[in-house]
């Protein structure tokens, strides 16, 4: 509901370009709204961003189980945003069953822009499309969370049930046609 089709199309175009430099990647669109709402209504606002990212990691791990991926890969860049500080990345990593690889972690903005221009993703990444990440963003994000504090917040939530609810609203997106195949249909479990 908060991810416009134009954003899915933009990400699909970028994924197609990236597939020229890697094995054939797949695009999964996960609806985090159930988790975001519960976090917004239940947890301290300053921890929202880290909690959202931990849910993304938990869901990505479930998708990785199905695709047999041995690691997760992100475009995180140290210090770029509140969730990408060393303390917060460590807390986010703790939610993962797999290594999280961050090839851009030490790049500065100019390096990242130069790389994007070289591989052909710069123009596409500049497209102005509303982003779903800002809908529930806190005004006071914590830049130095601890695992203990985050686990206290998560204790207020039914994390496994929320992950399942988000997965039930996840789909694999065909990069060319944008056709969506629901998670339950992919996994043979329509009642995820």
Residue ranges and their predicted role:
Residues 1-118, 188-190:
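ATP-dependent adenylation/nucleotidyltransferase module used to activate substrates
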Residues 25, 68, 85, 89-98, ...:
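Peripheral terminal appendages
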């Amino acid at each position: 509901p908060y991810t416009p089709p134009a954003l899915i199309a933009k990400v699909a175009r970028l994924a197609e370009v990236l597939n020229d430099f890697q094995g054939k990647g797949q695009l999964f669109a996960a609806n985090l709204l159930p988790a975001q709402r519960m976090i917004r209504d239940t947890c301290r606002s300053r921890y929202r961003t880290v909690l959202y990212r931990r849910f993304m990691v938990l869901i990505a791990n479930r998708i990785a189980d199905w695709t047999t991926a041995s690691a997760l890969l992100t475009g995180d860049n140290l210090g770029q945003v509140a969730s990408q500080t060393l303390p917060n990345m460590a807390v986010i990593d703790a939610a993962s069953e797999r290594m999280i690889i961050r090839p851009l972690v030490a790049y500065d903005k100019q390096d990242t822009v130069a790389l994007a221009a070289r591989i052909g993703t710069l123009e596409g990444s500049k497209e102005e499309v509303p982003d779903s990440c800002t809908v529930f963003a806190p005004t006071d994000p914590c830049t130095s969370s601890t695992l203990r504090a985050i686990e206290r917040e998560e204790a207020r939530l039914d994390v496994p049930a929320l992950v399942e609810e988000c997965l039930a609203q996840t789909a694999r997106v065909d990069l060319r046609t944008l056709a969506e195949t629901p998670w339950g249909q992919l996994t043979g479990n329509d009642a995820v």
